[in-house]
Amino acid sequence: MSQGRKAAERLAKKTVLITGASAGIGKATALEYLEASNGDMKLILAARRLEKLEELKKTIDQEFPNAKVHVAQLDITQAEKIKPFIENLPQEFKDIDILVNNAGKALGSDRVGQIATEDIQDVFDTNVTALINITQAVLPIFQAKNSGDIVNLGSIAGRDAYPTGSIYCASKFAVGAFTDSLRKELINTKIRVILIAPGLVETEFSLVRYRGNEEQAKNVYKDTTPLMADDVADLIVYATSRKQNTVIADTLIFPTNQASPHHIFRG
């Protein structure tokens, strides 16, 4: 049996919750799951931008008519809304099998001493606190059936800190530490905890970081070939479609011409 067919069988009928699903890696992951499963999955797609989610759902309905999709406008930084969101999912989407904690952001490139307090709070609320809150809300579902996959999106910034990125780096180090601790807490279960740490990926990430400045965002990827969102999505789907006795616990994924945050060949 081919690897693709095995993956499709392992993913068939499963329900996956993806945060930050309206664009970038989240959107690509939704589509990659349906490609890998021949459309035989249920997707819960959560993000702030409902109109983008509805556009994605239309695309899915056309390309994968057998797939079931639930879209939800959700600001993951509003902690009080997380648990009710999970509890009030439609009945056919309640039995979540895979959680992809994808939502994340960076803001600015200020040095310590110049960073706005609200930016510090926003980055940690999104990248760390929300990820923990969603994991805590979904984990009882996994514990009840002794199975499930938790995928946390880390970053090379969570392994190799760099100047002018202190808050983002700190938040991603926190994600790595939380993921490692959680994996150890769940060692006596069949729940898999997976960290995917990308390097340079061309998405809306830099546009958000530089507050809509397109020129600054484009310069991040200038004269090099970054990863694309579907490259990371492919790895997420691969990791969650392995045999139950296997966990791709911690993976760093770079474009070919990158070796660290500031070792990127441009030419």
Swiss-Prot record:
SUPFAM superfamilies: NAD(P)-binding Rossmann-fold domains. This is NADP-dependent 3-hydroxy acid dehydrogenase. GO terms for molecular function: carbonyl reductase (NADPH) activity; diacetyl reductase ((S)-acetoin forming) (NAD+) activity; oxidoreductase activity; serine 3-dehydrogenase activity. It catalyses: L-allo-threonine + NADP(+) = aminoacetone + CO2 + NADPH; L-allo-threonine + NADP(+) = (2S)-2-amino-3-oxobutanoate + NADPH + H(+). The active site is at Y168 (proton acceptor), Y168 (proton donor), K172 (lowers pka of active site tyr). It holds the Pfam family adh_short. It is an enzyme of class 1 (oxidoreductase). Optimum pH is about 8.5 for the oxidation of L-serine. Stable from pH 7.5 to 10.5. The keyword Isomerase does not apply. NADP(+) binds at I18, D75, N102, Y168, K172, V201. Belongs to the short-chain dehydrogenases/reductases (SDR) family. Its EC number is 1.1.1.-, 1.1.1.381. It comes from Saccharomyces cerevisiae (strain ATCC 204508 / S288c) (Baker's yeast). PANTHER family: ALCOHOL DEHYDROGENASE. GO terms for cellular component: cytoplasm; nucleus.
